[in-house]
Amino acid sequence: MRDKIKLESSAGTGHFYTTTKNKRTMPEKMEIKKFDPVARKHVLYKETKLK
């Protein structure tokens, strides 16, 4: 089953992306570099709980 997750910027801008992931094939927390439009550069986004 794919669960909804929130990827939050580590730059401290408060920007986030929402996506889904398969917890069975990827049980660890996701970390991915994506573009932060507030900081206007690519930064590390870390998985947090989607409320």
From Swiss-Prot:
Residues 10-20 have a biased composition (Polar residues). GO terms for molecular function: structural constituent of ribosome. Residues 1-23 are annotated as: Disordered. InterPro entries: Ribosomal_bL33, Ribosomal_bL33_CS, Ribosomal_bL33_sf, Ribosomal_zn-bd. It holds the Pfam family Ribosomal_L33. Keywords: Ribonucleoprotein, Ribosomal protein. One of its GO terms (cellular component) is cytosolic large ribosomal subunit. Transmembrane segments: none annotated. GO terms for biological process: translation. PANTHER family: 54S RIBOSOMAL PROTEIN L39, MITOCHONDRIAL, LARGE RIBOSOMAL SUBUNIT PROTEIN BL33M. Belongs to the bacterial ribosomal protein bL33 family. This is Large ribosomal subunit protein bL33. It comes from Chromobacterium violaceum (strain ATCC 12472 / DSM 30191 / JCM 1249 / CCUG 213 / NBRC 12614 / NCIMB 9131 / NCTC 9757 / MK). The lineage of its organism: Bacteria, Pseudomonadati, Pseudomonadota, Betaproteobacteria, Neisseriales.
